[in-house]
Regions:
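Structural micro-motif
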Residues: 42, 93-102
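Thiol-based oxidoreductase modules, predominantly thioredoxin-like and allied folds used
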Residues: 65-87
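Non-catalytic, surface beta->alpha helical segment in thiol-disulfide oxidoreductase systems
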Residues: 102-137
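Loop/turn elements at helix/coil->beta-strand transitions in domains of secreted/extracellular proteins
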Residues: 39-43, 74-79, 106-110
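Bacterial N-terminal signal peptides that target proteins for export
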Residues: 2-12
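Local sequence-structure signature of Cys/Sec-based thiol-disulfide redox active-site neighborhoods
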Residues: 31-64
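N-terminal leader/targeting and pre-domain segments
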Residues: 24-39, 132-136, 141-151
């Protein structure tokens, strides 16, 4: 019984990671762009690689965080992009490493890219920055340092 639990637990965790629910059902890049325009929501392109330890960690912690996940489901269209398989899209966005988060506005205009692993508490602030369109008023670092008022 103990051996079965030891074998079953890692298998369940791996299946959960592979089946991580995309908050908005976008089948491909063009579909995600159309969905973002239709719903007037920003688009998050999340580039990952199955062989990337930081990607696995980001999905296990940051993207699995209840607060982050709730914001993504409610306020964003999300497209997970396997950088190893979607080479055209990876080239288009000049992805040189994973994980990488590209944020686009509802019209598809590129806002900014954040490469690397990001902790959940910081990712929530970044999502708020994009959701609230604070990028039109201040740069991201000021928002992170001073908040939405900039003071």
């Amino acid at each position: 019984m103990r051996t079965m639990k030891k074998t079953l637990f890692p298998l369940v965790v791996m299946v959960m990671l592979l089946l991580w629910a995309v908050p908005a059902p976008a089948q491909d890049y063009n579909g995600a762009l159309k969905e973002a325009q239709r719903e007037q929501k920003p688009l998050l392109l999340y580039f990952f690689s199955k062989s990337c330890a930081y990607c696995v960690e980001m999905e296990r912690t940051t993207l699995a965080d209840k607060g982050v996940n709730a914001m993504l489901k409610k306020d964003f269209v999300v497209l997970r992009v396997d950088a190893d398989k979607s080479t055209d899209l990876t080239r288009l966005y000049r992805i040189s490493g994973t994980p990488s988060s590209w944020f686009l506005d509802a019209s598809g205009k590129r806002l900014f890219e954040l490469p690397g692993y990001i902790r959940a508490k910081d990712y929530k602030k970044i999502l708020e920055y994009v959701k609230g369109k604070y990028y039109a008023k201040m740069d991201l670092q000021d928002f992170l340092d001073k908040g939405p008022t900039g003071k």
